[in-house]
Amino acid sequence: MPHRYFTTEIADGTATLRGADAHHLARVMRGKLGDTVILCDGNAVEYTAVITGFGPETVEFSVEPGYPSAAEPSVEVTLFAGYPKQDKLEQVIRHGVELGCAHFVPFFSRYCVAAPKKEEQKNERYNRIAFEAAKQCGRGILPDVALPLPNFGAVCRSLEGYDLVLFCYECGGAPLRELLANVRPADGKKPKIAVITGAEGGFAAEEAEMAAQAGAKTVGLGPRKKM
């Protein structure tokens, strides 16, 4: 299977790869003239590309016409994730990318154990993790990670424009399958779904009420079953 790389420098049948990925292809993978790779523009369009040249910090390609990436889900998912303790947000982002999330919005809430600290520096690292995960699992877009929201009220004020908002509540709710049954594309656009998950401490009752007032649908995964 050809290696995959992201680049926005694709036009008129040619493309350029720069930076760490160019170094990886040229030095680590020892790419040669005529080798074929897959390039993705980060907007779910992929290109079959043939290496035509190497510069000091670039790799040049000729590319065939683009085609839609088959790796993207039929919905656009934003994950609002309660900020977990230690480095667990890295795992949330990595696995969320693998599962098809397009956007990540961490937030602090009543029962979060973690506290804000050097969030701008962390955000750079989180976006790098999302980028690497997208490359590794063959995504057609570059998922992004926002700076964390300071409280749950800020989350609720961010929920306009979604076709469906799912509030994952430990006290139960409607079956997920039922809530997703009527989600359909409209006017050729992907449905936009927001999923809200809590940190280790879950949600306060008043936060659940705020979510409902903001239009969120409370969802549960059903009762635990004994093995």
Per-region residue spans from a language model:
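A C-terminal functional module that forms or caps the active site or interfaces directly
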Residues: 190-210
